[in-house]
């Protein structure tokens, strides 16, 4: 595999790894329905595959990090709006901290510092 293709493959894996954090972070700012989350992540070039969002939202609800509320829509059927639970906000803070630590470690490694 050439370096460019391999780098693209690794980038896809990194995006998948960050997807939970990105979804939670997006919902931490305001309640959103799945289409808004997908659009926001797509605009940020963070979306891996649209079909991964719905199972992820269900999993985050199952684990108690998200809640949903059905709301009528002016355009089309009712929409399911997602918001974070207290545990969801705690998870966002924990992930933010760990990502900063990883970023710092990578910067140190690039500088040649242990």
Can you annotate each of these PLM segments?
Residues 31-34, 61, 78-79:
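A generic structural signal for ordered secondary structure
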Residues 64:
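Glycine-centered, phosphate/nucleic-acid-interacting loop/turn motifs that mediate DNA/RNA or nucleotide
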Residues 1-12:
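Short, Lys/Arg-enriched N-terminal segment that forms or immediately precedes the first helix
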Residues 74, 78-96:
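Basic, amphipathic "hinge/linker" alpha-helix immediately C-terminal to the N-terminal HTH DNA-binding motif
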Residues 54-59:
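Short, hydrophobic-biased segments on the C-terminal half of alpha helices
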Residues 90-114:
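Amphipathic alpha-helical dimerization/coiled-coil segments
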Residues 11-52, 71:
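N-terminal helix-turn-helix DNA-binding core of bacterial DNA-binding proteins
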């Amino acid at each position: 595999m050439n370096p460019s293709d391999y780098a693209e493959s690794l980038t896809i894996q990194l995006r998948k790894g960050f997807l939970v954090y990105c979804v939670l972070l997006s919902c931490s700012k305001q309640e959103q329905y799945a289409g808004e989350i997908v659009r926001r992540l797509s605009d940020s070039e963070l979306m891996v595959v649209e079909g991964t969002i719905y199972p992820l939202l269900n999993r985050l609800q199952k684990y108690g990090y998200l809640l949903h509320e059905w709301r009528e829509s002016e355009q089309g059927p009712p929409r399911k709006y997602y918001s974070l639970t207290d545990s969801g906000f705690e998870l966002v803070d924990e992930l933010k901290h760990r990502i900063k630590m990883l970023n710092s470690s990578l910067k140190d490694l690039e500088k040649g510092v242990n």
